[in-house]
Amino acid sequence: MVKAIKVMLIPNNVQKTKMFQYAGASRFAYNWALAREKESYEKGGKFISDSELRKEFTKLRHSDEYAWLLNISNNVTKQAIKDACTAYKNFFKDLQKFPRFKSRKRSMPKFYQDNVKIQFSNTHVKLEGFSSSRKANKQKKNWVRLAEHGRIPTDVKYMNPRISFDGLNW
């Protein structure tokens, strides 16, 4: 059985900044993939698969103009591109309207975390890419505090973990 659990995180200021950077990179990757798909369709081309778009995006990440993307986990941008391709496919299957570009004002800041690399304890969660030190005494600083202790079960498999900002809390 698949069950959704939504919990509130209490990040410090450095972690909040990192989360907003991840959400911005996710929005950028989604918009970039949607623009590439739209451009290809207008030129009469076929649908570009998400694997091809991810390869192009990897080359884009390593260019000097987009060097800021190298500080972001690749799983965040990879899933955003997959989401854009899924939304585009659903439009052509008449399941949804045409996907809209995400804006800073209108869209909810959110991003994906890899379910293999995310770790949970009773009181904290460790997100991918937040570790800044390998020293044992500073490892706990990389963990984000949970508002509700013991809410997340630790002995289950996690599917598609997403982190979103609702305007007040993560």
Language-model-derived ranges and their functions:
Residues M1-W170:
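Nucleic-acid substrate recognition interfaces
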